[in-house]
């Protein structure tokens, strides 16, 4: 039963990306970023061959929920605008809750690395895949001239509860340098 459900979710994501690609032609790396159920941080580090760093734009805690707005950068290139919402009440273990809270508040650590650091077994459920209209503020943060970019929203699930809800806008277009060497 579980395998069937996972297969259905995967097929829906595939179909959503294929449908989106017909109206907004996507780069292959955008398709991968939109559809992954793994770490975006890891994919960015592989694609851009450097460490992913976080620049926090805004952060606040309201009603025991952390709201964080960041730019993910590799080699100082802004690649992703992300907004995360972390309801701390969903982390039942007090020590873990405090450590995650400390990591989110005191350091510019990507969420993928926080999950890896604490060895959390999580899964991601994609809720939305589409295109975002980019205003001048976001164009400036992402150092892009594109007025529309790929966007997704997903939940990170830990122990059957939403650990985080994340919305990401991907600005990788025109920023990935292709290798020009050939292998003989």
From Swiss-Prot:
Name the UniProt key words of this record, in alphabetical order. Answer: Lyase
Question: Which superkingdom is the protein from?
Answer: Archaea
For the protein in the UniProt heading, the enzyme class is: lyase
Q: Which GO terms describe its molecular function?
A: lyase activity
EC? 4.1.-.-
Q: Looking at the keywords, is Kinase present?
A: no
> Pfam families, from UniProt?
Rv2949c-like
Q: Which Gene3D superfamilies match?
A: Chorismate lyase-like
* InterPro entries cross-referenced by the UniProt entry: Chorismate_lyase_/UTRA_dom_sf (IPR028978), Rv2949c-like (IPR002800)
Q: Which family does it belong to?
A: Belongs to the chorismate pyruvate-lyase type 2 family.
Protein's name according to its UniProt entry: Putative lyase MJ0807
| Organism (species) | Methanocaldococcus jannaschii (strain ATCC 43067 / DSM 2661 / JAL-1 / JCM 10045 / NBRC 100440)
**What are the top taxonomic ranks of the organism?**
Archaea, Methanobacteriati, Methanobacteriota, Methanomada group, Methanococci
């Amino acid at each position: 039963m579980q395998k069937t459900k996972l297969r259905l979710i995967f097929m829906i994501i595939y179909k959503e990306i294929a449908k989106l690609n017909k109206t907004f032609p996507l780069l292959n790396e955008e398709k991968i970023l939109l559809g992954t159920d793994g770490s975006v941080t890891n994919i960015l580090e592989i694609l851009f061959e450097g460490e992913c760093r976080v620049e926090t734009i805004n952060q606040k805690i309201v009603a025991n929920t952390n709201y964080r707005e960041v730019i993910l950068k590799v080699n100082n290139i802004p690649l992703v605008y992300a907004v995360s919402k972390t309801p701390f009440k969903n982390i039942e273990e007090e020590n873990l809750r405090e450590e995650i809270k400390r990591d989110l508040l005191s350091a510019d650590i990507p969420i993928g690395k926080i999950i890896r650091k604490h060895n959390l077994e999580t899964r991601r459920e994609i809720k939305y895949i589409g295109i975002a209209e980019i205003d001048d503020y976001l164009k400036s943060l992402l150092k892009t001239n594109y007025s529309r970019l790929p966007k997704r929203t997903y939940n990170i699930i830990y122990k059957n509860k939403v650990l985080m809800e994340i919305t990401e806008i991907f600005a990788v277009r025109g920023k990935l340098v292709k290798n020009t060497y050939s292998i003989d």
